[in-house]
Regions:
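A ligand-binding cleft/hinge motif common to bilobed small-molecule-binding domains
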Residues: 138-149, 240-270
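Hydrophobic residues within well-ordered alpha-helices
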Residues: 112, 183, 240-246, 286
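A conserved helix-loop-strand patch within extracytoplasmic ligand-binding domains
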Residues: 35-49, 129, 133, 141-208
């Protein structure tokens, strides 16, 4: 299966889960990029989440992106793009010199408009006059328009992917749930995108309301696990973490991520589809910033060649003629 071929190299990188501590279990996330013989800190959901690559200003290519397509994007950026450069003799891309930041869209917007991010007690400045600043930004159209209004990105983006809406991700300890109606009636502890990700949260709620009605939707959200120790406000980390640690019974998350995590943690998690959810899917687009390096041009060329097949293989919609459509911001 084509999707299986895409997931295979990622799943090889998923290490065994760490032993159970008194209160929580560390979840070993898929690792990307070259191995470095450096001191490393890994907390319960990784100490510095969703920064892949150097943050000292040495990166040849820097991409800030909404994080929910990372299972497709990171292998393309860190493996296939350097291979493409060598094969076409078009560029020289060292994966050790590429930085990809994969955070929720509101966090990406805040980093770029407020000038940085605090990582615990450490502060990483971000800006066109700072060592760290993206060449390219990938996100939905609404956040890209915010960045355009702030003068961060150029005026035209191109659509490269469309999500297929939400799916269900369940702990394998939960039995008797095979569809959305059963999910709504039997899940007593729900984990879902927090208010820090309003776009995804609203999309899931709208899907539930269309499928189940407002009353059943409100009842299900009444069982939401709102917070827990170590929650990041990043659904692609919080949802599987809560399920694996028995902090929740079932979660709502993008369907491609539900399938990815069920394949990554087959002993712990299972995924279910939601027929009809695809009509609530959303576009993801790419745009250059006001400070793009030369390598970004080569990456865009490569990316727009491979994305039409790589994203459907990873559980996204087939875009057809709408792929690459320019959108004014």
């Amino acid at each position: 299966m084509r999707r299986g071929r895409l997931l295979a190299p990622l799943l090889i990188l998923v290490t065994a889960l760490a032993s159970v501590s008194a209160t929580a279990q560390s979840v070993s996330w898929p690792a990307f990029g070259p191995l470095r013989n450096l001191l490393r800190f890994d907390g319960f959901t990784d100490t510095v989440p969703d920064f892949v690559g150097p943050i000292d200003g040495s990166a040849q290519l820097t991409i800030f992106t909404e994080g929910n397509h990372y299972p497709v994007l990171l292998p393309l950026v860190l493996q296939r793009f350097p291979e493409w450069c060598r094969a076409h003799q078009a560029c020289d891309a060292d994966p050790a010199g590429i930085l990809v930041v994969t955070l929720p869209q509101p966090m990406v917007v805040r980093m770029l408009t407020e000038g940085g991010i605090s990582l615990g007690n450490a502060v990483l400045p971000v800006g066109p006059d700072k060592p760290v600043f993206p060449d390219l930004v990938m996100a939905g159209l609404a956040p890209l328009r915010q960045l355009r209004a702030a003068g961060v990105v150029e005026g035209q983006a191109r659509i490269f992917a469309h999500t297929l809406g939400m799916g269900m991700l369940l702990s394998k300890t939960v039995a008797g749930v095979d569809d959305l109606d059963q999910f709504s009636r039997r899940i007593n502890r729900l984990i879902v995108a927090s208010p820090s990700e309003p776009g995804a949260r609203q999309q899931y709620r709208a899907t539930l309301a269309a499928q189940l009605g407002e009353t059943a939707t409100a009842q299900l959200f009444g069982h939401e696990v709102v917070t827990f120790a170590g929650r990041l406000g990043i659904q692609h980390r919080d949802v599987p973490y809560a399920l694996i640690n028995d902090l929740a019974d079932g979660g709502l998350i993008f369907s491609h991520l539900a399938n990815f995590y069920a394949a990554a943690f087959p002993e712990r998690l299972r995924a279910l589809g939601v027929p009809g959810a695809e009509r609530f899917g959303q576009d993801i687009a790419i745009v250059r910033t006001t400070r793009s390096h030369a390598l970004a041009v080569s990456f865009e060329r490569f990316f727009m060649e491979v994305a039409p097949t790589a994203y459907p293989e990873g559980g996204f919609a087939v875009l057809g003629p709408t792929f690459g459509a320019p959108v004014d911001l």
